[in-house]
Amino acid sequence: MSEQDVSQAAWIVTLPDHEATEDFARKLAEELKAGDLVTLSGGLGAGKTTFARALVRTLANEPELEVPSPTFTLMQIYDGPLCPIVHADFYRLSGGYELVELGWEEMTENAIALVEWPERAEGALNPDHLDIRLDFAPGGRGRVAMLTGTGTFASRLQRIKAFRNLVDRCGWSDAVRLPMPSDASVIRSYERLIKMNGETALLMISPPRPAGPPVRRGKPYTTIAKLAETVHAFVAMDKGLRALGFSAPYIYGEDLDAGLLLIEDLGVDPVVDEKGPIPERYAEATRLLVKLHSTELPQVLPVTDGIEHEIPPYDLEALLIEVELLADWYVPHIVGTQLSGSARAEFLNLWTEALGEILVGPTTWTLRDYHSPNLIWMAEREGLQRVGLIDFQDAVLGPPAYDVASLLQDARVTVPADLELKLIGLYARERKAADPAFDVSAFARAYAIMAAQRATKILGIFARLDRRDGKPHYLKHLPRIEAYLIRNLAHPALAKLKVWYESYLPRLIPLEDETPPSA
């Protein structure tokens, strides 16, 4: 094992025996996908055959599959459940030019390729790949795997290494991993980990958010809108909510730099059923907000030793850039053209005026996505702890009315107007009981304004998810959000904005003798 090999490796794994080599190959196979290239090298007896056989068998999902050496055939191709697997040995290759004759690029474009003797290809292989070199451990006891990622695989290898270290440290290294359905996030994903005894946990994969293009005064949209840029915000809010006695997930382990968290699995029981909101569960979620909003809350929360998270303010700049999403994405989606400069300026001026009273009102922790996809019913617990909370990393210091509107005008399921009104009344009564100074009429105005702001924003977000992110299934929710917005614009506090929507989005705001779109 040369000093150069060790110095260049991004990850060095000690493999004490034959079984450890096979186990490592199986775990590495979980990380590979169609189009990946893995190059494998090492001296005679270093364990290449053992490693390659275990890797191919795992990828093919056939534990007893025969995996002969491709030394004389150059390539062996296997059918996998997700994609083909190409196992190649280039020892007999004369040069990289022969890959063209073999049709290598076409053969491996949608396959996982494992190549032994990659140096014989003379640099003709994809530069984005994972290189694994096996060698004898010092003293001849076991083997050592030296892994290096090149090109785009360099960052992937760092995440793989961080994940393996995290689950090993937390005692979850042998758990089965199941991907979970993706949410509206373009950078965050989840996996459910299941141990042999049935115990489960969730892996939250939330790498640092890449800086987007500047959109205003040199700042990207995410910074202006106060969206979390690292996993630190989730950790801080999680600890803060748990300290108040709420059912946020316990964090078993973390790698803050990699953006990996191993967290408690709160379950899958929702607050809705096939008919829509379950009133008793929505009522309990409403009471949770009453308790949160009636509590004096810190603005700075600890993340870990020496690191704190300051909850950002939900300021005018953030609120306005959110409503602009309607102009940027929803209007072109519905009307087919952009707003004129004057129409856009009027829109922003009216929203600035409407939000003025919000900005001087009381603030609290605004969790921001407090609605059915992020609320889990935990019947085995008692009281407010039956409401499990997730997806609160974008929390800001904002108006109490925002999260109430987020819940009672749920973006993913229609909340009937009578249930909405009943739960608004529940919230107002219990806030008033906790604090006689609570201003019910001011809250009602704030609710209408923030519900309209949120609906306006979401119309833009769902149109953007379709056009920019290739997620058209969010468009099915537009009629519901439109109906909510119509409901909100009926409040006198939004009279001027209602005229604007009637003028520039007549499809959205019908004439008084027309029937509004159903939810």
Regions found by a protein language model. Name each.
Residues 67, 71, 75-117:
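Conserved nucleotide-sensing/catalytic segment adjacent to the nucleotide-binding pocket
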Residues 170-196:
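ATP-binding glycine-rich phosphate-binding loop
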Residues 2-6, 11, 105-163:
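Short phosphate-coordinating micro-motif centered on Lys-Gly-acidic
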Residues 458-519:
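ATP/Mg2+ or Mg2+-diphosphate-binding catalytic cores
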Residues 325-334, 400-436, 452-468, 481-489:
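Active-site activation/catalytic loop segments of kinase-like enzymes and analogous catalytic loops
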Residues 297-312, 317-318, 322-366, 379-381, ...:
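An alpha-helical support segment within catalytic cores of ATP-dependent transferases
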